[in-house]
Amino acid sequence: EYLGDWQDREGNSNVEEEILSNWLASQGHNATIINKVLTKLDKDKAIGGATQLYDANRAVYDLLRYGVKVQPEAGEQKQTIWLVDWKNPENNHFAVAEEVTILGKPHTKRPDIVIYVNGIALGVIELKRSTVTASHGIRQNLDNQKKEFIQHFFSTIQLVFAGNDTEGLRHGVIGTPERFFLQWKEDGDIDNPLDRSITQMCEKSRFLELIHDFIVFDAGIKKTCRTNQYFGTLATRERAVNREGGIVWHTQGSGKSL
């Protein structure tokens, strides 16, 4: 769903509570459960005091990945409430908004495109003209993650993108240094490298798979996969299921380790 141009919309957030509430209700949850889920999500995504962006982002990821544990009423057994239907991608509400104005302290910023799943901002894309390098978009994303800009908005963001029509799409996660933003290299029928990579990485099932299966939090650093690591893992998984052996052939610097 296209949510529109949110440049002048008030109250833009990384959790659009009305959308999330409606989706949770469509999954059969009552108002009491939904309010408790929203309260937990709001608490865990907050940055402040000893809680840094990495900590809040990891806490939100745990809620996304493993569900929110909610006790409906006193004395009742806890239930796991899922914020995302990982098994059935089409059962989720996917939406994008452009020019999303986010109020910061003291500076306000406006990400080009935000990808929402069930009302939760999970991806952000900075797009540049072909005459402006993708690195400019990467640095813009990194600046936006600073405390003086809109750091709080990135507490739910799982994948960070930047690109242009000539260089294609680069991807990383929160805190990824500019030099580690990677180009997604996959053959396809679309000639334009930016359109091709966005279509490949942001396809519903692929987007959720990358978040669910290809993100790690390693000693204070959040990481995601390169293209070859993604396809190598899928091939290895298929062989393991079929009880077949094999060799994954790597070259120096190809990402054998995290």
List where the protein language model places each region.
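ATP-dependent helicase/translocase motor core
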Residues: 2-258
